[in-house]
Amino acid sequence: MDIARKRLLFRARHMGTNENDIFFGGFAEAHLAELTEEQLDRFQTLLDVNDPDLFLWVTGAKPVPIQYDHDVMAMLKSFTLDHSHK
């Protein structure tokens, strides 16, 4: 794994709330290797967003703002849905 992906993995595992650490860290472990450079940029942008907002978006409790409503967010929402029932 290259340095950029390792940094993203670390950030995803240490977001601030336990729930986001689990969802985003798990997503990163499962998908970082397959993401394109553009998708990595979008994922990094999501990691910069306020933690409570991210949780509400990926769980579907709040609508995702248009600037964050992209393929990576869809992947995260799907991952979260699949893993929240386990």
Language-model regions: role of each:
Residues 2-86:
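Positively charged, polar, low-complexity stretches
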